[in-house]
Design a protein with these regions (language model features):
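NAD(P)H-binding glycine-rich loop region in Rossmannoid oxidoreductase-like domains
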Residues: 60-113
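Functional cation/ligand-contacting sites centered on basic and imidazole/sulfhydryl donors
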Residues: 378-503
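N-terminal Rossmann NAD(P)H-binding glycine-rich loop of SDR-like oxidoreductase domains
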Residues: 13-36
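Alpha-helical substrate-binding/gating segment
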Residues: 196, 201-204, 213-251
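Catalytic helix-loop patch of NAD(P)-dependent Rossmann-fold dehydrogenases
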Residues: 109, 141-186, 208-211
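Mid/C-terminal beta-alpha module of Rossmann-like enzyme folds, strongest
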Residues: 229-294, 299-300, 310, 316-393
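Short alpha-helix in the Rossmann-fold core of NAD(P)-dependent oxidoreductases
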Residues: 108-115, 119-122, 134, 169-170, ...
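Conserved Rossmann-fold NAD(P)-dependent oxidoreductase catalytic core, especially the SDR/UDP-sugar
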Residues: 95, 116-163
């Protein structure tokens, strides 16, 4: 009788398959889901490394609703085990920074293969038992959004920055999952995640961000809550089959300068002006924006804790997981007594081989200089801190035209209206979900992918990166590109830019 009751209780639970549970967002999501043992059965897929086994062993003992599948996202059979019988798939896993920044081939292999495996496994399920799929995309898909275009929304052009193979794989994986024929899906594009370990990041990539660039950050706790909330049965039907931006709200809309100030203050370090040169930072070709549609996801899922941002940074600095040295520095502010010593360490990082911005300048690495500064002349024209504008970015959004009547449901648009949208992208709509770009490539894509997701021709999609040329034939894309680039620019970045990065 007891076994029958247990089976009945289990039958009522939602079965979740989560990838990426040992990563920052995935772990937060796992811990949030495990708080509701009466509602969920949780399966996770994790590589059988010693580190993962040590991390997950205590949880496996504490939580009877947790089932660990030891395997690999790039192996279809392992993914199929997790997907089979699940009610919802949360695909969070893949290679991310900092590993992804140094391993382009491995990043492409892992992230794209994982998306293909998840899609194949979901489509292999009986149609009446096909799980919902939530894909975690990235703000990196949207590329460089400098002023005055630092406000954006889902449906804006996909525009992955040159050298950003991670962003490229996230865009490709999003297309694979959301345009595959899966019945019920959602793509949630993650921003920068605030979590305690970010306070100890020390990497030359820290200088790849423009000082006046922006991000609408998401806290790790909000991100974890989001993953649990999207699994609830009360999520309405109209939520699904759409694209969303993840952020913790207006309080977390920061310029990169404001972020540096908050971070450095939290760990007791001097201000940016005392420990960095302004020209160590790039002036373009990163990613990040504030969200015009940022509250849309919150209105559906109610995942934000709305902790004041200064308070949140103070909390991070007190996190038990931080190294003792950082906690000591945060408490004593001792580094503020030795700004020159801190600057020496930062100078060393800016001059790091291959990825240091000053290494590019010293060795005249022209593709990097053109991508991240425009030209050597533009680099030399960067003002010092005394003359640098670090004021808060404009709070007035500039709305990009998506080329169709957005008051209408995209599924109700006529062929003529779709052709108008295609013409705005330099192409044609040929009917039956078939499109043609300005270069004559013909491709299949759903109207949701094109109009709500901001994707376009897969044959024109990098690499090579040739956005200067795309802007000349695609008015939709030109809205984003032309205001930020000189018309004479004609940069093309092929796969050769990654030569020598990895074996």
């Amino acid at each position: 009788m007891k076994n029958e009751v247990n089976r009945a209780q289990r039958a009522k639970k939602t079965c979740i398959f989560l990838t990426g549970a040992t990563g920052t967002m995935g772990y937060a999501g796992m811990m949030e889901i495990l708080r509701y043992p009466d509602q969920y059965e949780l399966r996770i897929l994790a590589r059988p490394s010693q580190k993962n086994k040590e991390l997950l062993a205590p949880l496996n003992l504490q939580h009877s609703t947790l089932n660990i599948i030891w395997g690999d996202l790039t192996k279809y059979e392992d993914v199929l085990k997790g997907v089979t019988g699940a009610d919802i798939v949360l695909h969070v896993g893949g290679m991310v920074s900092p590993q992804a920044d140094y391993r382009p081939k491995a990043t492409r292999r892992t992230n794209i293969t994982a998306a293909e495996n998840v899609t194949k496994a979901v489509l292999a399920q009986p149609e009446d038992h096909q799980p919902k799929v939530v894909y975690i995309g990235s703000v990196a898909q949207m590329g460089d959004r400098r002023e005055p275009l630092h406000w954006g929304r889902a449906g804006d052009p996909i525009c992955v920055s040159a050298y950003d193979h991670y962003g490229l794989t996230k865009a490709q994986a999003e297309r694979i999952i959301t345009d595959s024929g899966i019945k019920t899906w959602a793509s949630l594009r993650q921003s920068g995640i605030l979590y305690p370990a970010i306070l100890k990041n020390y990497d030359p990539i820290m200088f790849h961000v423009p000082i006046r660039g922006v991000l609408e950050w998401a806290t790790v706790e909000d991100s974890g809550r989001l993953l649990e909330r999207v699994c609830r049965p009360e999520v309405p039907a109209e939520f699904w089959n759409n694209y969303y931006n993840i952020g913790s709200g207006a309080e977390y809309r920061l310029s990169n300068y404001e972020f540096e100030c908050l971070l450095l203050d939290a760990i007791g370090c001097p201000k940016p002006e005392q420990i960095f040169n302004a020209n160590w930072f790039t002036t373009r070709n990163f990613h990040g924006m504030w969200y015009i549609d940022g509250d849309k996801l919150e209105n559906y899922l109610h995942f934000r804790a709305n902790v004041p941002v200064k308070e949140y940074f103070a909390r991070m600095a007190k996190a038990p997981s931080l190294p003792a040295g950082i906690k000591f520095a945060a408490k004593t502010h001792i580094a503020k007594l030795f700004p020159h010593c801190v600057k020496l360490a930062m100078r060393f990082m800016a001059n790091s081989k291959e990825h240091g911005t000053q290494w590019w300048i010293k060795h005249n690495i022209e593709p990097r200089i053109h991508a991240y500064y425009g030209s050597l002349e533009e680099y030399k024209a960067i003002p010092d801190w005394k003359h640098f504008d670090v004021s808060h970015n404009s709070e007035t959004p500039v709305l990009l035209d998506h080329g169709y009547d957005e008051s209408k449901d995209v599924d109700s648009l006529t062929d003529a209206e779709l052709n108008k949208a295609a013409a705005f992208r330099g192409g044609k709509y040929l009917g039956n979900d078939t499109w043609q770009c300005a270069q004559g490539h013909t491709f299949k894509a759903s109207r949701r992918l094109i109009l709500l997701g901001g994707h376009w021709c897969p044959d024109c999609f990098p690499m090579p990166w040739a956005w200067d040329r795309e802007a000349k034939r695609n008015p939709f894309f030109a809205q984003l590109w032309a205001p930020l680039h000189d018309p004479s620019e004609d940069n093309v970045y092929g796969p050769e830019i990654f030569d020598g990065w990895e074996k």
